Amino acid sequence: MSTPARKRLMRDFKRLQHDPPAGISGAPQDNNIMLWNAVIFGPDDTPWDGGTFKLSLQFSEDYPNKPPTVRFVSRMFHPNIYADGSICLDILQNQWSPIYDVAAILTSIQSLLCDPNPNSPANSEAARMFSENKREYNRRVREVVEQSWTAD
């Protein structure tokens, strides 16, 4: 059955295939346009450089009027990412707009990696470290990057 949400997701997928933003990829799981797997590559010249981070995106029939549920499957250490992989990002909550597509969502998450908001922490330890001990924070991020190479 082709619903407005499914049509929009097909359009998002085609756009992502034909004009993929640098450092991100995503596709629906087999036979389920409402559930996507995605990968964000750590941006160059940052502590995240070289990392390969997996995410899942769960869309509802209310998409694009409501945002998907997005979470990292990969283990993360970041001020705005909860232990369960959920992401504290305004466009996934109160700043959502139907103009955002999958590419915009993933690009925003990639930007968040390098530009966290320690004033809205999902991980208080990472937020404190980011603000008070950047060297140790970067070391912990590098550990997560190395783990991303071997994680399933």
Curated annotation (Swiss-Prot):
The active site is at C88. Keywords: ATP-binding, Nucleotide-binding, Transferase, Ubl conjugation pathway. The keyword Membrane does not apply. It catalyses: S-ubiquitinyl-[E1 ubiquitin-activating enzyme]-L-cysteine + [E2 ubiquitin-conjugating enzyme]-L-cysteine = [E1 ubiquitin-activating enzyme]-L-cysteine + S-ubiquitinyl-[E2 ubiquitin-conjugating enzyme]-L-cysteine. Residues 4-150 form the UBC core domain. CDD domains: UBCc_UBE2A_2B. It comes from the Eukaryota. GO terms for biological process: protein ubiquitination. GO terms for molecular function: ATP binding; ubiquitin conjugating enzyme activity. Its EC number is 2.3.2.23. Disulfide bonds: none annotated. It holds the Pfam family UQ_con. Pathway: Protein modification; protein ubiquitination. InterPro entries: Ub_conjugating_enzyme, UBQ-conjugat_E2_core, UBQ-conjugating_AS, UBQ-conjugating_enzyme/RWD. Belongs to the ubiquitin-conjugating enzyme family. Catalyzes the covalent attachment of ubiquitin to other proteins. This is Ubiquitin-conjugating enzyme E2 2. It comes from Medicago sativa.
